[in-house]
Curated annotation (Swiss-Prot):
It is found in: Cell membrane; Myelin membrane. The modification Phosphoserine is found at residue 114. A lipid is attached at residues 6-7, 10, 109, 141 (S-palmitoyl cysteine). Belongs to the myelin proteolipid protein family. One of its GO terms (biological process) is central nervous system myelination. One of its GO terms (cellular component) is myelin sheath. This is Myelin proteolipid protein.
């Protein structure tokens, strides 16, 4: 069997659910981390410019924002590696499942790839043997995890629960900014509300962003409307919305990964009891 034909047969048996979930995971994490990082920076500038002139009032908030930004760096790195590992697991276990059902034989493709990788090693001497030994060590390390979907089911389930909390927390700043924007709309169109314009305020202390002794801590009336019209406020609001969408996409990808891994684990457990892959 030629290499092209082998690749075509391997693509037929590709784990499309894992491929879609991986793309969605990378897209969601990139959107959440990138937009979330910039939105936190914009929030810091808005607070120190309009809501408090005393640095001690928002010093704790800045420390929290910087801590979250460092967590974002780690989250992006972790999900990139874990998503790639889940994709590799999807290819491995899907091949094992389809071998049980007889859809295609992975050993044929394996032989073709092996011939391609190891071909011509005799002429390369010790260098070729060293490369083959390195590849064998990588395969040995991955083999401890790949082919064991039960491990990935447990880890992915725990990550899904944790990310569900992250998804819920990402909705909080969207809610705060939406309330502020709604208040600005009421100020811009006084006919829609019976309250006086001067009594319509956005109070950062009410949401726990600033301590209650912060001054002024809130912005009211036409001053608030001027803040809502700034490009900085609009950009930060939309960045938080984008981060929320990214968190939702990542949650969907984790659920897809978990369903696919659970299915593969069930098939291998129930129908492949006497088979080793």
């Amino acid at each position: 069997m030629g290499l092209l034909e082998c690749c075509a047969r391997c693509l037929v048996g590709a784990p499309f659910a894992s491929l879609v979930a991986t793309g969605l995971c990378f897209f969601g994490v990139a959107l959440f981390c990138g937009c979330g990082h910039e939105a936190l920076t914009g929030t810091e500038k808005l607070i120190e410019t309009y809501f408090s002139k005393n640095y001690q009032d928002y010093e704790y908030l800045i420390n929290v924002i910087h801590a979250f930004q460092y967590v974002i760096y780690g989250t992006a790195s972790f999900f990139f590696l874990y998503g790639a590992l889940l994709l590799a697991e999807g290819f491995y276990t899907t091949g094992a499942v389809r071998q049980i059902f007889g859809d295609y034989k992975t050993t044929i493709c394996g032989k073709g790839l092996s011939a391609t990788v190891t071909g011509g090693q005799k002429g390369r001497g010790s260098r070729g043997q060293h490369q083959a030994h390195s590849l064998e060590r990588v395969r040995h390390c991955l083999g401890k995890w790949l082919g064991h979907p039960d491990k990935f089911v447990g880890i992915t389930y725990a990550l899904t629960v944790v990310w569900l909390l992250v998804f819920a927390c990402s909705a909080v700043p969207v809610y705060i900014y939406f309330n502020t924007w709604t208040t600005c709309q009421s100020i811009a169109f006084p006919s829609k509300t019976s309250a006086s314009i001067g009594s319509l305020c956005a109070d950062a202390r009410m949401y726990g962003v600033l301590p209650w002794n912060a001054f002024p801590g809130k912005v009211c009336g036409s001053n608030l409307l001027s803040i809502c019209k700034t490009a900085e406020f609009q950009m930060t609001f939309h960045l938080f919305i984008a981060a929320f969408v990214g968190a939702a996409a990542t949650l969907i990808s984790l659920l897809t990964f978990m369903i696919a891994a659970t299915y593969n684990f069930a098939v291998l457990k129930l129908m492949g009891r006497g088979t080793k892959f």
